[in-house]
A protein has these predicted regions:
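Extracellular polysaccharide-recognition and catalytic grooves
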Residues: 1-129, 135
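Ser/Thr/Asn(+Pro)-rich, low-complexity disordered segments
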Residues: 45, 85-222
Length: 222
């Protein structure tokens, strides 16, 4: 179970708020099921993000360029609020999504301690694949305390509505936009032609070009 239009802006934010609303004001099975779905979504976020940097593939209608900021999607802003309950030094500055973040301040739902632990500080190295159902693409992640590699996904044809993105390398820095982080594009300029699922344990590859941020340099190049 999960969202058909997974990781999608702006749909994720409004659906997430609806689930919080059901958890807060419904009862019985509806409250229980909404809580389980919220738990699952937050656990997936914990695995696919690094210090609130989050740039996964998503499903949504074509026609708009994907956002270039990597630290303020509508899921991130809520986790920043909940994370600040565990770490008082955590900055909750956000470039957008304040109206969604407000929900996290007044509802009784809170992610589990273990989920927040993985959001704030990865306890051990890991490599995971998270599926999103038929005619979709997986999220593939490799990371530990010092980095996270996030696969960009693969479009499955126009009817799939999958928006493939670059493979991202997140580091312990203050990068807030895609251009500030190392990333790898798929071949060509059209994301519909991309298969950016080439993330393995501690390693990633693609057929496209590599973007090196202005203030960084590659250790080796060819």
């Amino acid at each position: 179970y999960g969202f058909y239009e997974f990781n999608s802006a702006p749909y994720l934010g409004y659906t997430y708020c609806a689930l919080l609303n059901l958890y807060e004001f419904a009862s019985g099975d509806i409250r229980s099921l909404s809580g389980k779905l919220l738990d699952r979504l937050n656990w997936q976020y914990a695995l696919s993000s690094y210090k609130f940097k989050h740039f996964p593939p998503n499903r949504r209608r074509f026609g708009k360029d994907f956002k270039k900021n990597i630290d303020s999607d509508y899921h991130t802003v809520m986790l920043k609020v909940w994370g600040s309950l565990y770490d008082e030094s955590l900055s909750v500055n956000m470039s957008r999504g304040q109206h969604h973040a407000l929900w996290a301040t007044f509802v009784s739902y809170k992610p589990a301690d273990k989920v927040i632990q993985w959001v704030l500080d990865k306890p051990k190295p890991y490599f995971v694949k998270m599926g999103h159902g038929f005619n979709s693409c997986p999220e593939i992640i490799s990371g530990d305390k010092s980095y996270l590699l996030s696969a960009g996904g693969a479009n499955q044809g126009r009817r799939s509505l999958i928006v493939a993105k670059p493979i991202m390398l997140f580091l312990d820095d203050d990068a807030s936009e895609m251009k500030h982080a190392f990333h790898m594009f798929g071949p060509g300029d059209n994301f519909i032609d991309w298969n950016n699922t080439g993330v393995y344990k501690d390693f990633a590859c693609t057929k496209g070009k590599v973007h090196i941020p202005v203030n960084k340099k590659a250790l080796k190049s060819s």
